[in-house]
C-alpha cells in the first residue's frame, strides 16, 4: 500500500510502498478515504524540536481521517465491517491514575497515532477498535475527516459556560475557526475573533463571528472593552501577547480556556488580570472520551455546525507536497487529502 512516512530524522516526508498493517486482537483494519493535515503533521514535516523529542522514524504520519472498516479482529461489536468511521488519535492505557479517574484525555501513557505508531496517511490503517467512532450517514466524508481536531474545539468550548455570553476567540487557525460555530450552537450571544491574518478573519466571519479584529491594525483590548468586555476568552493562538490581551479583556469573574501552546514560557500580570478579577483559567488537552465525541458528532450530524466551510483545500493523495505547502502558507483552513474512493 502507499503511505506518507517520516522515513528519517530529517526535514520532509515521502511516499513509500509498504506492506498492509497486521491487525492484532481487539484492533480493526480501516480503509482510509480522506485524511486531513494537522499542525502536528507540519511540525513533523519541518522536524522541529517538538517532533524530534517524540518521534522515532520511520513512522507513517497522520491522525485525522475518515474511513471504512474492512475487518475487526475479535472486537466488542462497537463497529462492524462496512461502517464509516472517524477515530480518536490518542491510544490510552486504561490503568494510570488519570484513566482510572475517567480522565482518559490526560492519560499518562498516551500514544498518538501518526507520532508514536503508524498513522492515517496511508491507504489502510490498523487501529484499536475502541478508538473508532461510527458516523451516521448525515455526516459528510469531508466533515468526518476533520472530526478529530473539531473535538479540540468542542472540548475547549465545553470547558466554559458560553450560554448568553460574549465570547472572544484569540487566534483563528483551523481549530479556532471551528470553535466559533460550536460556541454559537451552545448559546453564545456574540462572538469576536482576533488574529493577524485577514484570510483567517474572513473564514471566521464566514462561520459565524459577529466581529473580527486584525490585531496588527486595531487595538483588540480597547474594542472589546468598549463593547462591554469579554465574559469568556478562548485562547487558541499560543501567543503570549494574545494571552495577555485576552486576560485584559475579561470582565471580573470571567473565564478563559487555553488550547494554544506557547513556544516558550510566558509572563502574565497575575495580580491585576487574574487574581484581583477572580478569573477562572482552564488548560485544555485532547478530547474528553467520549463526551466530546458524542457532542461533536451530534452538532455536525444535526446540521448545527457545517464543517465543510472550514475545509478550504482538497488534494489527491499523491499531491501531498502541494497539500503541505497550502497548509504551511497561512492562507488555508483545513487541508484534506483524498486517499481513496
What does each model-identified segment do?
Residues 139-217, 222:
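Mid-domain Rossmann-like dinucleotide-binding core that forms the NAD(H)/NADP(H) cofactor-binding site
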Residues 160-163, 202-280, 321:
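Glycine-rich cofactor phosphate-binding loops and adjacent beta1-alpha1 units
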Residues 3-22, 39-71, 86, 106-116:
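N-terminal glycine-rich cofactor-binding segment
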